[in-house]
């Protein structure tokens, strides 16, 4: 399926991007910083891989692979990523690694997948078992944090861990429903603080 305007837009983004300064995440560049490991870049790279799957155009795969390869070292460590930061947002970009590993089998991608999965093993949790959004936000569960962690978590469990963590993930969703869903509207609040220390 041809989408000329869409393809032109995506191609321009790629042409204006370098591996350190992607055009779609220009905020870092404006701050004088190189891009690191983050959900914004992860979302875009995953989109490029989906475009590659839909069109077969190798330029999308090649850019995506180069972008991630630039950040992932041979031992699986990831530039500007730290497990000990316990930032659930940084798990999201790990979804790119599943797609790339399936396409090219680079062992360093599998090692990086395992590294990110190790964060979930030690990520601080609420008493009911939900991942804290970030170590700097103790006892807080945010709705977007569910998007950041759970798809990666479930893909790992499905592909590599005989689905052992699926019940844990399900329970986290049920806790979110219990604490964050407005019964009258069916809509969800953005977050909750189990400690009740935050003003909201």
Predicted regions and their residues:
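Boundary/linker segments of alpha-helical solenoid repeat arrays
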Residues: 77-79, 108, 183
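Hydrophobic alpha-helical segments of small multi-pass membrane proteins
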Residues: 92, 115-119, 172
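Mid-chain, structured segments of secreted extracytoplasmic proteins
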Residues: 60, 65-95
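Low-complexity, Ser/Thr/Pro/Gly-enriched N-terminal "stalk/linker" regions
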Residues: 1-72, 107-115, 119-123, 127-128
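Aromatic- and glycine-enriched pocket-lining scaffold segments that form the walls
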Residues: 127-193, 198-200
């Amino acid at each position: 399926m041809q989408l000329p305007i869409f393809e032109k837009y995506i191609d321009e983004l790629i042409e204006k991007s370098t591996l350190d300064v992607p055009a779609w995440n220009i905020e870092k560049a404006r701050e004088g910083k190189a891009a690191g490991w983050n959900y914004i870049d992860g979302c875009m790279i995953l989109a490029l891989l989906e475009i590659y799957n839909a069109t077969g155009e190798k330029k999308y795969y090649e850019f995506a692979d180069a972008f991630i390869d630039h950040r992932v070292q041979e031992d699986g460590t990831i530039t500007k990523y730290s497990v000990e930061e316990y930032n659930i947002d940084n798990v999201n970009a790990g979804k790119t690694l599943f797609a790339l590993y399936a396409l090219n089998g680079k062992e360093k991608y599998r090692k990086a997948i395992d590294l990110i999965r190790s964060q979930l093993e030690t990520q601080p949790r609420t008493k009911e078992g939900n991942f804290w959004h970030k170590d700097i936000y103790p006892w807080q569960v945010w709705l977007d944090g569910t998007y950041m962690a759970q798809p990666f978590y479930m893909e790992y469990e499905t592909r590599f861990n005989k689905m052992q963590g699926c019940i844990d993930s399900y329970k986290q969703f049920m806790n979110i429903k219990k604490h964050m869903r407005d019964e009258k509207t069916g809509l969800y609040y953005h977050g909750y603080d189990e400690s009740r220390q935050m003003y909201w």
